[in-house]
């Protein structure tokens, strides 16, 4: 699977979970579990409750995603 197959959504962080994982409500009212991308961990970018984030998801599992950008 290439990067072209990934789907991007914008959402809001609802809940902070352990291990850099978050419950995110997407703009289409779905709630998913998302983890922080490696570059965000490496650069120590903090994500707080209520932050607007961009989430990248695979079309095979629409319940999990990866946070790639904080707005």
Swiss-Prot record:
Keywords: Cytoplasm, Initiation factor, Protein biosynthesis, RNA-binding, rRNA-binding. Gene3D superfamilies: Nucleic acid-binding proteins. Residues 1-71 form the S1-like domain. SUPFAM superfamilies: Nucleic acid-binding proteins. The keyword Nucleotidyltransferase does not apply. It holds the Pfam family eIF-1a. It comes from the Bacteria. One of its GO terms (molecular function) is translation initiation factor activity. Disulfide bonds: none annotated. One of its GO terms (cellular component) is cytosol. It is found in: Cytoplasm. The keyword Protein biosynthesis applies. Component of the 30S ribosomal translation pre-initiation complex which assembles on the 30S ribosome in the order IF-2 and IF-3, IF-1 and N-formylmethionyl-tRNA(fMet); mRNA recruitment can occur at any time during PIC assembly. PANTHER family: TRANSLATION INITIATION FACTOR IF-1, CHLOROPLASTIC. One of the essential components for the initiation of protein synthesis. Stabilizes the binding of IF-2 and IF-3 on the 30S subunit to which N-formylmethionyl-tRNA(fMet) subsequently binds. Helps modulate mRNA selection, yielding the 30S pre-initiation complex (PIC). Upon addition of the 50S ribosomal subunit IF-1, IF-2 and IF-3 are released leaving the mature 70S translation initiation complex. Belongs to the IF-1 family. This is Translation initiation factor IF-1. It comes from Rickettsia felis (strain ATCC VR-1525 / URRWXCal2) (Rickettsia azadi).
């Amino acid at each position: 699977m290439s990067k072209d197959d990934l789907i991007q959504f914008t959402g809001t962080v609802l809940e902070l979970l352990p291990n850099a994982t978050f419950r995110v409500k997407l703009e289409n009212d779905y709630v998913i579990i998302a983890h922080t991308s490696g570059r965000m961990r490496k650069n120590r970018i903090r994500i707080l409750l209520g932050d607007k984030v961009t989430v990248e998801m695979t079309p095979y599992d629409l319940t999990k995603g990866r946070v790639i950008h904080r707005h």
